From Swiss-Prot:
PANTHER family xref list: ATP SYNTHASE SUBUNIT B (PTHR33445:SF1), ATP SYNTHASE SUBUNIT B', CHLOROPLASTIC (PTHR33445)
Assigned keywords, A-Z: ATP synthesis, Cell inner membrane, Cell membrane, CF(0), Hydrogen ion transport, Ion transport, Membrane, Transmembrane, Transmembrane helix, Transport
Transmembrane residue ranges: 17-37
Keyword Metal-binding: no
Compartment(s) of residence: Cell inner membrane
Chain's role: F(1)F(0) ATP synthase produces ATP from ADP in the presence of a proton or sodium gradient. F-type ATPases consist of two structural domains, F(1) containing the extramembraneous catalytic core and F(0) containing the membrane proton channel, linked together by a central stalk and a peripheral stalk. During catalysis, ATP synthesis in the catalytic domain of F(1) is coupled via a rotary mechanism of the central stalk subunits to proton translocation.
Stated name of the protein: ATP synthase subunit b 1
Family matches, as InterPro entries: ATP_synth_b/b'su_bac/chlpt (IPR002146), ATP_synth_F0_bsu_bac (IPR005864), ATP_synthase_B_chain (IPR050059)
C-alpha cells in the first residue's frame, strides 16, 4: 500500500516537471516559427532567439531550484520511511521469534511436568500394589502362626488331660488291686485297656 502511494507521488512530480519543461521549450519555438513565417524575407532573428533560449535556461533553472529541494526531501523522507518500516518489521520478527521460543519452552516444561505426574502416579500404583501384597503376606503369616499356636495349645491341653486321666487310672487301678488282690500282670492289662479306650476316644 505504501509502495504504491510512493510511486504515485513520484510519478506526479516527474509529470509536472516534464510538463513544465515541454511547455518552456514549445512556447519559444512556436513563437519563432510564427515570427519567421510572417517575415520570411528578413530571415531568422538570432538575437531574439538567443534571448528566448536564455529565458528558457533561466526558467528551467528556476523550476529546478524550486522543485529540487522538494524532490530531494521527498526521496529523503521516503528513504527514512522505508528504513523505519524495515526496522519495525525486523523488531516485529524478533518479537515473534521471542514469543515462539517462549511458548515452545512453556510447552516443553508442561510436557515434562505431565510426564513427571504420570511417573509419580505409576510409582504410587506400584507402591500400593506392593503394599497390598506385603500386607497379604503378613496376614497369611500371622494366620499361620495363630493356627500353629492353637494347634500347639490344643495338643498341650490334650496331653495334660491324658496325664490327668492316666493318674486317675493309676489311682483306680491301685484301688482295684487293693480291693481285689489282683496280680501285677492283671494290673498292666487293665492299664493298657484303659489307655486304648482313651486314645480311641480322643
Amino acid at each position: 500500500m505504501k509502495k504504491s502511494v510512493w510511486h504515485h507521488s513520484l510519478k506526479g512530480y516527474c509529470g509536472r516537471i516534464a510538463a513544465v519543461l515541454c511547455f518552456s521549450v514549445l512556447v519559444p519555438l512556436v513563437a519563432m516559427a510564427a515570427e519567421g513565417g510572417g517575415h520570411g524575407e528578413e530571415g531568422t532573428d538570432w538575437v531574439n532567439f538567443g534571448w528566448r533560449v536564455l529565458d528558457f535556461i533561466i526558467l528551467v533553472g528556476l523550476f529546478y531550484w524550486l522543485l529540487a529541494s522538494k524532490v530531494k526531501s521527498f526521496f529523503s523522507g521516503r528513504r527514512e520511511e522505508i528504513k523505519t518500516t524495515l526496522e519495525e518489521a525486523r523488531l516485529a520478527k524478533e518479537a515473534a521469534e521471542h514469543k515462539f521460543k517462549e511458548y515452545s519452552e512453556k510447552l516443553d516444561k508442561a510436557s515434562k511436568e505431565i510426564e513427571g505426574v504420570y511417573e509419580m502416579i505409576r510409582a504410587q500404583g506400584q507402591a500400593e500394589k506392593e503394599k497390598i501384597l506385603e500386607d497379604a503376606r503378613k496376614a497369611a503369616a500371622k494366620m499361620k502362626e495363630d493356627t500353629q499356636a492353637r494347634i500347639e495349645q490344643e495338643l498341650k491341653k490334650a496331653s495334660q488331660q491324658l496325664r490327668m486321666e492316666a493318674v486317675q487310672l493309676s489311682v483306680h487301678v491301685a484301688e482295684d488291686i487293693l480291693k481285689r488282690n489282683i496280680t501285677p500282670e492283671d494290673h498292666q492289662s487293665m492299664v493298657k485297656d484303659y489307655l486304648d479306650k482313651v486314645v480311641r476316644k480322643h
